[in-house]
Amino acid sequence: MDPLPRRASLQNTGNVGEGWVRQYLCQQGWQILAQRWRCPWGELDLVAHKADVLIFVEVKTRSPGSWDRGGLLAVGIPKQRRLIRAAQAFLSQHPHLSELSCRFDVALIERRASREGVSYALVDYLPAAFEIC
């Protein structure tokens, strides 16, 4: 099997999952400031603002029964460090946001395939999933 189509398919799956979380956050009153923001230390899936809080959201889209508990185990200490560094880079480019309280959230999206097609659902949203140590 050619890895390029699979990679494109996985990337599209991730994009759809991020879209679901983006919609969820907007419904909760959050203003999306960035999606798939990249820097040398990594990527921030979503950055959003509401009141005096800035959130950096890591989105994991998985099929049921995935090895990493729906994506949760994929956000281990090394990934958290990369997200923190990326958030610091984001704040250095947007200093007007640096006075806000910052939070790291994780959103878990489930992708189900059936004969009728593919469906997505927000399984869990974990505010303050990890803290800066």
UniProtKB/Swiss-Prot annotation:
InterPro entries linked to this entry: Restrct_endonuc-II-like, tRNA_endonuc-like_dom_sf, UPF0102_YraN-like
Pfam families: UPF0102
SUPFAM superfamilies per UniProt: Restriction endonuclease-like
Molecular function GO labels: nucleic acid binding
Highest taxon of source: Bacteria
Family: Belongs to the UPF0102 family.
Protein name according to UniProt: UPF0102 protein CYB_2119
Lineage: Bacteria, Bacillati, Cyanobacteriota, Cyanophyceae, Synechococcales
